[in-house]
Amino acid sequence: MIIKVMVMLLIELTYAFIFVIIAVLIAYREKLGIEKKILYVSILALIQLFILGFVLLYIFSFGMVGAFLMIGVMITLASYLIMREINLKNKTKLFICLFITFLTTTIVSLAVLTIPKVVKFEPIYVIPLMGMVIGNTMNTIHLALDKIIDMVKSERDILWGYLALGATEIEALRPFIKNAVKSAVIPQMNRTKSVGVIFIPGAMVGMLLSGANPIYAAEIQIIIMWMILSSAVISGILICYLMYKEIIRA
């Protein structure tokens, strides 16, 4: 049975690989110089997703303990990746604050979804949903920190002006935080307002392909979109306030 399933997977993936071949041929024809990169990222995605599939099969056997361990690993990796990219001196504090921010948005999202039983408190639901939260929160945090650091560096005279007039560091930084978070959340707001009109999002597509009721699929998808939008706002504001001293001295 397992061999039959694997053979079917290989056949289906072989057909689907036509998309990659088309992209490579066009890149080669137009001399874009990215043919090897297209092949590399495509094969890398294949390997990573299959590894993820086998890891999830193993984790699901441990129940919610395995789910929490998986979420902990995702939060740790997300914190490390952003810490490495953001140009702030105190990397240790940045990592801790990033971890706290990811953990906060994850706990809030998990509580809102599972306490009223909007979704079942099971690994098969919790892991992918929290993965969506962490992944989208990564983008918002990165954009917010990049934006506020650039603003502080380019408009330092304005910041010192607020401080000279007697404002506290938090009060002086608040206008910068406001603009940075607004900029960081705009991409998610655009995705939220265009969902169902311009594109059908991944979670809903997956449910429809698995034979779910379209109305139920739409309900779950809008819950996910609201959850991600909320997490984006919370994470953007929280990380800026937690790191305000380091941001001012950037």
Curated annotation (Swiss-Prot):
Task: Provide the membrane topology annotation.
Answer: Multi-pass membrane protein
UniProt keywords (A-Z) are:
Cell membrane, Membrane, Transmembrane, Transmembrane helix
Membrane-spanning residues: 6-26, 49-69, 95-115, 124-144, 195-215, 222-242
Q: What name does the UniProt record give this protein? A: UPF0014 membrane protein MJ0938
Location of the protein in the cell: Cell membrane
**GO cellular component term of the entry, any:** plasma membrane
Predominant localisation class: membrane
Q: Would you identify the family this protein belongs to, as annotated?
A: Belongs to the UPF0014 family.
InterPro entries attached to this UniProt entry: UPF0014_fam
Q: What is the native source organism of this protein? A: Methanocaldococcus jannaschii (strain ATCC 43067 / DSM 2661 / JAL-1 / JCM 10045 / NBRC 100440) (Methanococcus jannaschii)
- All disulfide bonds of the chain are none
Organismal lineage: Archaea, Methanobacteriati, Methanobacteriota, Methanomada group, Methanococci
Q: Which domain of life is it from?
A: Archaea
Q: Does the keyword Glycosyltransferase apply?
A: no
